[in-house]
Structure formats: C-alpha cells, structure tokens
Amino acid sequence: MKRLLALAMTTLLLISMLSGCGSTEQPAADENGVYNVAIIQLVTHDALDAATQGFQDALIAELGEGNVTFDLQNAAGDTNTCATIVNSFVSNNVDLIMANATPALQAAAAATADIPILGTSVTEYGVAMGIENFSGTVGGNVSGTSDLAPLDKQAEMVKQWFPDAKKVGLLYCSAEPNSQYQVDTIKTMLENLGYTCTLYAFADTNDMSAVTQEAADNSDVIYVPTDNTVASGTGIIDGICQAAGVPIIAGEEGICAGCGVATLSISYYDLGVATGKMAAKILKGEADISTMPVEYAAVSTPKYNAAICEALGLTAPEGYTAIG
C-alpha cells in the first residue's frame, strides 16, 4: 500500500512539473519590491526615443517611483547586437522585456519563451512573428503595441496634396519586413487612385543614396513608410529629393521632420505609454500576456514640414499642423 501511495504521489508530481513546462513565468518583484524591466531599442531616432520615454513614464506612474528599475540598451541598428543584448537580459532573469522595433522583438522572442515580452513600434505582428492569418493576439509570452499608420488615409493624402501627379515612388529598406508590408499595401491603394507606383528598395545605408537618386529621377512624388533605416538617414534622402524638387509624403512625424512635406502620424510617445500600461498589468498579475491582443494607436494627426514646403513652393491644405 505504501509503495502504491508513493507511486501515486510521484506521478502527481511529474504531472505538475510537466504542466508547467512552456508556460510564461509570472513576474515577481525582488526582495525590495522592485521590478526589473529591460528595454532593447533597435536604434536612436525620434520615434523610437519617444516610445521608450512614454513606456518608462507610464510604468513609473503605474507602479510608483522607486518600484521599477530599467536596463535600457540600444543595438545601434545591428540585429546581431539585438541578440546579444536580449540574451544578457535572459541571463539576468529580468521580469519583463520591452522590445522597441521589429528586429528587437524578433530577437527577444527567439531568446526566451518564458519572460514576458512587449513590443512597440512594430507595424505588423503577423509579419514580424511569421504568423499566417494573424488574429490580433500573438499568444505565448509576446504582445505589445503597433505603430501601423492608417495607410488608406495616407494614400488619400497623396491625392490631396498632389492630384496631378502621375508617378509615385515607394522608397524603403528591403531588410525591414514591416516596411515591405506597408509599401505593398499602400501601392494597391495608390494604384486604385490612378497613380503608377514603383518600388525603390535599398538594402541598407550603403546603397540608400543611389536608390534615392533613382527614385527622385523617376517619380513625381515619393512615399516613405515607417522605416527605421529611413528614419536614420533622412538627411541623405532630403538632400537628394529637395535638390530634385521631388516632395515626400512620410509614414510618421519624425521622418517627415527630416525629409517630408506631410504626414498622417501617430504619437510614438502615446504608443509607449500604452505599452507601459500593458506592462504594469502584467507585472501586477492583472493580465495574462498570452491572451492580450496587440493594441493600436487610436489617433493620427495630419502634420506638415513648413521649411520643406516653403523650399518646394507648397502650401499645406487646411487642417494640417506644422511640425515642431
């Protein structure tokens, strides 16, 4: 009888252990009641910086000053560095990882299936995570916020500003899958509005100038999506396109400030705030990340770059706010 009881207890223990395998760890504050939150940001530019700041501000507001510490690391645009950074986060057993931009999210998801991961500044989670027929919830230990702009309204913006244009160049970095998603989507929308569209893809900053020049030489107007490589190289793009007299409609405000004439942009700071509020719910045990749907920005604002508009002789339509 004792042997049978021992066998039964062993079996129950094994079942309990196996049932816990692959589950997301419940975050727990350290002995001082402080949560350790790690942040990996792909690269430095205005949009990502704003999202990171919003995330930190919101999490401090939700948890209280002194109840959360941040380990903020920047990968300087290098995907290999992303992997190194997130592996160190996993080794340190942080309570939660915030991954700012798609390559950062992909690296974090590859590094751990246990620590909760929230993405932000990620355009399309189905594309980023390789999920076909994405339903809005990633599942497992991943969720976050999306910076997907209203592409249909941005296409209409091209028509509003440049109704007589014929050729639209779509300029983007081919190494960013979310940029590919955006240009493929808006291309169809623009073609339905009567434009002839051509994709101009550069691999990285090494061929950005040559591809931008080709786009400027063959386009009446250029559209650039929310693209981290573009955001880091707006000075190069602006120098070429202004000299050619070719205007740019940009996917977000930071890019527009650097090289565009107009944008319909979300607030990346507000996006970070929304991500921070999600993080607080997870850390406090109020939400299960595996069931949390990806959240989207609710508001987008039409803005214009007064300096570039003046240089190109353009006047903003009513309803646009000057950047900065």
For each predicted feature, which ranges?
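Short, low-complexity disordered leader/linker segments with a strong preference
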Residues: 1-36, 61, 65
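Hydrophobic alpha-helical segments within soluble ligand-binding/sensing domains
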Residues: 30, 125-167, 266-287
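Extracytoplasmic "Venus flytrap"
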Residues: 31-62, 71-81, 175-179, 227-232
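An alpha-beta-alpha
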Residues: 37, 55, 143-190, 288, ...
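Short beta-strand elements in bilobed, periplasmic/extracellular small-molecule ligand-binding domains
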Residues: 56, 61-82, 141, 189-205
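Beta-alpha junction/loop-to-helix N-cap segments that form part of ligand/metal-binding clefts
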Residues: 71-133, 224-251
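Pocket-lining segment of extracytoplasmic ligand-binding domains
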Residues: 177-246, 252
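Flexible loop/turn connectors
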Residues: 255-307
